[in-house]
Amino acid sequence: MADTPPSSPLSFSEFDSLSTAAWQERIRRDLKGADQAALEWHTPEGIVVQPFYHREALEGLPQGQMMNPNTQWLNMPTYAVGPADKGHRAIELAAEALTRGADGIYFELTDAAAFDVTFLHERLPLATTYIGYAVRIGAAGFVERLLATGTAGLRGFLRFDPVTDHTPDLAHQLADLRTVISLTRQLPEFRALTLNGAFFANRGGTVIQQIGFVLAAATTYLEQLPSAEVSLAEVAAAFQMQVGLNPNYFFEIGKLRALRRLWATLLHAYGLPTEAAQALRIFAATSTWSQTTLDPHTNLLRVTTETMAAVLGGADAVSVAPFDRIYQSPNEFSSRLARNLPVILREEAGLNRVADPAAGSYYLETLTDQLAREGWAVFQRVEAAGGLPTAIGLVLQELHSVAQTQFQRIANGEQIIVGTNRFQNPQEQFDYNPKRLLRSKEFDSTRAAYPSEVLRLATAMHFQRREKKRRRAAVVLLGTHTNQLILESFLRLLPQQESLALKASHPEGTLSVLFSTPEAATLMYATPDQFGHFARVVCRVPVDEPDFIPPTLLTADLATMQEAVSLFGFREFNVEGYSTEDVLARLQGRR
């Protein structure tokens, strides 16, 4: 066998360097007169992605956008601890996870006062275990309890964000936060102020909105926290940003890089040195917005994309949610898959061996700059409206508007969710009880796939009820204007030459419902008041009970349900020439 020749540096000196103009001319020739704009991608964020990028695009762009060379990101599973729960089971699960690939733990505490910090310290020594805590109230008291365990120090962070979480009595909460910063100022491995940027991602905000709104929330703290008790520099040093992730791979990479760049810009405006900006930590968590209950194993692919984006974007810690968390309490299997995903990216894919893999990419550097500029514009608009929390109404309205647009795009097929509105599995057998899920208060109705899911689950229940010849009836609340989304999804399945018209309008602000009997299913609509009164009658709830929240699924005997639907004036929503059964069967792939 011949000896392997020695390696030598590659040289492409025989090839002429081509400019951007030369490449554009070549594209014009190859397209033979076709419009070059057809090669561009216009994203929902308003970014125009070009068919190619050249090194000339980097000229004039800010350099050194990534200021965190640390490649050893932390793998931090999340454990939710409910009300009046001491957290013993979650702590035991966390201790086991730390022996099986986890680097740290993140606890989301509904009731921080009930959480047993003494037991926590016994099982997970606080001075050596990296732990994050999310609390909504009582932050100072909680940190005092942690320190009272006798620990020599704390590693990790506290997420207490009264601005983003809309906590009442903001002035009192800010005072609490100042106390937390004071208590932990001598603990360099503990971040006392983690901003909940995931809130905006989990409600469908665009990447640009997320950047702008996070900066607006951060500015509120930089403006309102400094006092005689804590300095501006101490507030900045305590900062960490939690961000939510979605599967838009390159844009998520650009989002994290843009946030670091703009954080440096923001601190520079406050007169703080570059070193203060370099200390920023980013904790990235996979988002609920993109998760589905239909064909749920596709969630594994989504969170893989999201986690890779976080790592390549420079996150300091990542939390990967189990693929089944939307419809059930995660089990050992789903939790293990989620925990192992970052380990594979580190140990097998080797993503920890390069400090900034995105650096120098013509596309990613350009995209980072575009996102930073557009995100800064959103930030300035919020500040012009009074900043947060004054402008929270504007922020929530913009998030709602974008979410509705995405629901519309999903319904008409412009935005694809694999397994939900495209490439569905008509024979899918659910690993959960659809009736129980629809009745659950924990079923997240804010996600992108929810309108499609609730219809699919209600339809499956209807056909099951009919096949088993059950004599009970059900009304399922589908959401606001879901009938219109159903119509658009149905139209997409029909030949283009078929022209359809609605028999009844769907007035603004009405709720969409599915009325299912053993014989037929009917799409209907009702005002919120009509549905509320209807639900009280069916559930036998007194009118004077103030805190009643109508459930998504209501069942009763057929006669009672028919009388109530008629009594409260529900109106039928029909597609001319097709029954509701035809529409639902076609959408579910039965016809």
Where are the regions that the model predicts?
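Flexible, glycine/charged-enriched surface loops at secondary-structure junctions
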Residues: 37-39, 227-238, 269-279, 348-358, ...
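Active-site capping/gating regions of soluble enzymes
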Residues: 240-426, 431-434, 563, 568-574, ...
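N-terminal glycine-/lysine-enriched basic segments
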Residues: 290, 322, 326-328, 349-357, ...
